[in-house]
Amino acid sequence: MRFLQIVSMIPGFVLVYPQVASIEVYEEVFPRLLLWIPAFTILMAATWLAGVAVVVRLLSVMIRPGFYSSHSAVAAAVWLTHVIMQRTLISAYPIYASGFTPAWLRLLGARIGKNVEISTVETIPHLTWIRDNSFLADHSSASTTRHSSHWVHIGTTVIGERSFVGNSGIVGPDQDVPDDSLIAVLSTNPGQVDAGSSWLGQNPHQIPRRVVDSDSTATYEPTRKLRILRGIVECCRIIPQMFSNLLDLLTIWVLTIIYMQFWFSDLSQAEALAWTSLLAWPVPVSYTHL
């Protein structure tokens, strides 16, 4: 993962470096770099996502449904896929629980239908099919693997049309959720069940359903206006990452000023180093507590 993080910054450096390479005075470098933070952030995020997609796709070649030894290469590929997907939930959180999530999972290899809402789902993408108008809530899991001390069970999952998997709901390997069904919060899929049923609990039992009429333009079929407004709001999710990069740059800027003021002064090298260390110390300390 560290390797992918480093690689994701390379295109941004390639873009920005020519803009400051000819500047000889450091006071002029940082203001120029500030102007490039938005472009650098977007390019870094896009490169990171592309790198994750490539790695997950490559690992998917090894991962096929079945039972495998816990010490096999397939088990290692499954483990690495889970690690990458979990890290992505943190590093690429702005694209989760948004209109971009279905496209992101398609890029990773999942089959995603129309008008699907997906939050922070954990899954093995290429083994998952989420059909039209379905909803997967926060921390839901699909095509999850089963483990013992000696084997790992890998299987596919299909979420039927207009079905709902609640918060932390689990749909295991080789299990499908039929159309118009509900797996409630903190519940598991009971296996082969009838369409239109609802299930609750870790040892799931069926619960009654209440018929409610609602406007489909506010749920399954939002208007174009709602889609556009949602897209505008969700595009703003990258702004906090831009501010994070801004703080990184400002920290380096302040440390550079302190270094240049004392290191090239009339003080001895020992005195300059002592003053530089003394004055620079509060900067990273205060930054880490923001």
Tell where the protein language model's regions lie, with residue ranges.
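C-terminal segments of enzyme domains that contribute to small-molecule binding surfaces
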Residues: M1-Q19, I154-G166, I170, S197, ...
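Hydrophobic alpha-helical transmembrane segments
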Residues: I23-L43, Y259-V285
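Membrane-spanning helices that line or support transport/gating and their immediate boundary helices
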Residues: A50-V61
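Membrane-interface amphipathic/juxtamembrane segments adjacent to transmembrane helices
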Residues: I63-A75
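Membrane-proximal soluble regions of multi-pass membrane proteins
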Residues: A73-A103
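Conserved small/polar residues in nucleotide/adenosyl-binding loops
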Residues: T288-H289
